Amino acid sequence: MPYNCCLPAMSCRTSCSSRPCVPPSCHGCTLPGACNIPANVGNCNWFCEGSFNGNEKETMQFLNDRLASYMEKVRQLERENAELECRIQERNQQQDPLVCPAYQAYFRTIEELQQKILCGKSENARLVVQIDNAKLASDDFRTKYETELSLRQLVEADINSLRRILDELTLCKSDLEAQVESLKEELLCLKQNHEQEVNTLRCQLGDRLNVEVDAAPTVDLNRVLNETRCQYEALVETNRREVEEWYTTQTEELNKQVVSSSEQLQSCQAEIIELRRTVNALEIELQAQHELRNSLENTLTESEARYSSQLSQVQCLITNVESQLGEIRADLERQNQEYQVLLDIRSRLECEINTYRGLLESEDCKLPCNPCATTNACDKPIGPCVPNPCVTRPRCGPCNTFVR
């Protein structure tokens, strides 16, 4: 607030009436809060009739200088106070449009990053579900593979047993062929023996016939031989047919077994080929699923690292903004404290100025109206002032002329 109307602008004249005379005995005490200003100015009997004392002039000059310096300091403090109030108003006006948009931008960035993090989490969840599905599919394929492998092992065991049976049948066939050969050889031996016996019998019968021609009637040996030959031939034919029928039956059975075994072998081989193809396809698909899982895990790791770095950057940005906000708040607190200090200084200066005003007004009322008069100081006009105050003059009362 301005103080131009509160105190008079003091100036000292060159005459004797421009300065009050303060005796040395009046400097004993000072006013509280008024730096070394005499408190008993005008209360002691220091009126003179002619001239002023040099100490009184110096005291008035000191008071005028102090008052001028205080007024200048008050004006400077008023200017600084006005500047601080303008700065505070500008800061209060600029605080909302400056801080809020910045925080809104940060909030938008944080929301975008949160949306990205949520999208990344959903993508990670989807990838985890896909990985679980791939694991379930791989487990299913592994179960199928183990089942097919067990079936393959069973089929291979059956094929091995059928191969053993085929080997046994081959051995039986070779044994039967050997038996047929031996029977053929035996048949040839029997034929040879039969021929030898027939020849022997013929020889014997021929001798007997010659002997018995004279003794007995003749016997038809050809018929007997033919009958014997027919009997043996019928027996040989019967044995041959039985052997041929048995051989044919065994051969047909073996052929049937071989055909069925070959069909089973072909079907087993086809199944084995199909199982091998299925196993290869499953292995390829399993390898693809493993590669997909590895790629998804790598993508997940990269996403986590990227989002963690972005989150750390956002945290650093938030920390910086919070530190700036703390600095701004500390600056505002410091300015408020300075403002309070200035207000306290202002109040003290106002008290001191009021003290000066009261002191000057009281002294103005106590000084005589005509310090140069010898009889009545208040009724007669003021005399002319001496141009040279240092010249010795008659002693008179103090001059109470102030220029407002």
UniProtKB/Swiss-Prot annotation:
It comes from Mus musculus. One of its GO terms (cellular component) is intermediate filament. Residues 1-56 are annotated as: Head. The keyword Coiled coil applies. Residues 56-367 form the IF rod domain. It comes from the Eukaryota. Belongs to the intermediate filament family. Residues 103-203 are annotated as: Coil 1B. Residues 364-404 are annotated as: Tail. The record marks 305 as: Stutter. Pfam families: Filament. Residues 57-91 are annotated as: Coil 1A. This is Keratin, type I cuticular Ha3-I. Keywords: Coiled coil, Intermediate filament, Keratin. The gene is Krt33a. There are two types of hair/microfibrillar keratin, I (acidic) and II (neutral to basic).
